[in-house]
Amino acid sequence: MIQPPLPPLRTLFFEDLSVGMTERLNKTVAASDVVGFAQLTGDRNPIHLSEHFAAKTSFRTRIAHGLYTASLISAVLGTRLPGPGAVYISQTLNFRAPVKIGDTVIVTVTVAELVAEKCRARLACQCEVGGEVVLDGEAWVKVPSENAKGKRPVPRL
């Protein structure tokens, strides 16, 4: 299946954010994504790569790496909310259910709290497949300020 191109980059500055702002990303997990993630990370657990092995597990089929699914959250943070220039500080992850090859993951990131004196945002993060939450948690990010010297660390695209 051909994936649509990634959404254009968008930088939001701390001053642009408000509690409740939300961004979403939909991604269908391809077998090639899982193989590529295994090659990139070195995690070659056969539950991800071997249909024969996976068939003998409780999942009955190959599943995506949990951190592959979590990396889709990073895609939202780095490209849309807040976008380029934001720096990850921390991330909690709760893995609730497996993600299988062919599943479409819907990633939702919502601004939950803003700390003005440090230009930090707490973001509620959730991944769903077919209406079921498969991963949730929260992220803290440092967000560029429009009032900082040099103003724009990256251009708005």
State where each predicted segment sits.
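HotDog/MaoC-like acyl-thioester-processing domains
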Residues: M1-V19, V99-L157
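Generic structural detector for well-ordered beta-strands
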Residues: R24-T28, N94, W140-K142
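Residue-level detector of alpha-helical recognition elements and their boundaries
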Residues: V35, H52, Y88, T92, ...
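Terminal targeting signals and extreme-terminal segments of soluble enzymes
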Residues: F37, I73, T79, R156-L157
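Short, intrinsically disordered, mixed-charge
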Residues: Q39-D43, G78-P82, V129
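Hydrophobic beta-strand-centered segment that forms part of the acyl-chain substrate-binding groove
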Residues: A55-A64, Y68-T108
